[in-house]
């Protein structure tokens, strides 16, 4: 047998036990990809004021061979501690996180790509003898199917005042705020296999 599959009695290509290919589905679907991460930290101060600032960027190009996927994340942190008076301490913490993910819907949280790949038989052909992709690789869903785009903006803020009116007597006041703005977009395309 010199072809990856043969037609059945209806003229359709065989793709399970009657096919003849030898496919490593993980290698067909995934590739090595680059990721980059950059960090910046600044801190300083004196006995009455201390500050810390950090920023981080992570970018990943994605590891799908078919159907583009990308991920970006930006994180910033800010901390400030001050003791302007003997009877008062001030602490401020702020954090901002931005995440963006763009990938085929078939690979999103409810997608079945990883589930399906681990159940594909090696003899299931990747392409038919005419050079067209077979339906088993889910390539049509990855390349022409639906997309999932999401971005998230998380902001955290914490403030604290510590009063020392008398020796060994502390009064603490805290405030915190967290906001999460999430944008999800999914476009659903019909895919024929």
Residue ranges and their predicted role:
Residues 29-33:
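Short Gly/Pro-enriched turn/cap motifs at secondary-structure boundaries
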Residues 155-161, 165, 169:
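Short, Φ-rich (hydrophobic/aromatic) sequence segments
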């Amino acid at each position: 047998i010199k072809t990856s599959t043969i037609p059945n009695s209806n003229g359709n290509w065989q793709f399970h036990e009657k096919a003849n290919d030898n496919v490593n589905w993980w290698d067909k679907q995934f590739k090595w990809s680059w990721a980059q991460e950059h960090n910046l930290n600044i801190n300083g101060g004196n006995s009455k004021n201390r500050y810390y600032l950090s920023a981080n960027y992570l970018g990943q190009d994605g590891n799908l061979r078919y159907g583009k996927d990308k991920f970006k994340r930006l994180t910033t942190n800010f901390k400030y501690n001050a003791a302007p008076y003997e009877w008062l301490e001030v602490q401020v913490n702020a954090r901002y996180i931005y995440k963006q993910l763009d990938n085929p819907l078939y690979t999103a949280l409810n997608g079945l790509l990883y589930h399906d790949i681990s159940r594909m038989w090696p003899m299931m052909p990747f392409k038919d003898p005419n050079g067209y992709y077979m339906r088993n690789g889910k390539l049509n869903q990855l390349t022409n199917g639906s997309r999932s785009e999401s971005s998230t903006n998380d902001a955290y803020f914490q403030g604290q005042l510590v009063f020392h009116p008398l020796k060994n007597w502390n009064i603490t006041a805290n405030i915190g705020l967290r906001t999460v703005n999430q944008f999800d977009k999914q476009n659903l395309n019909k895919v024929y296999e």
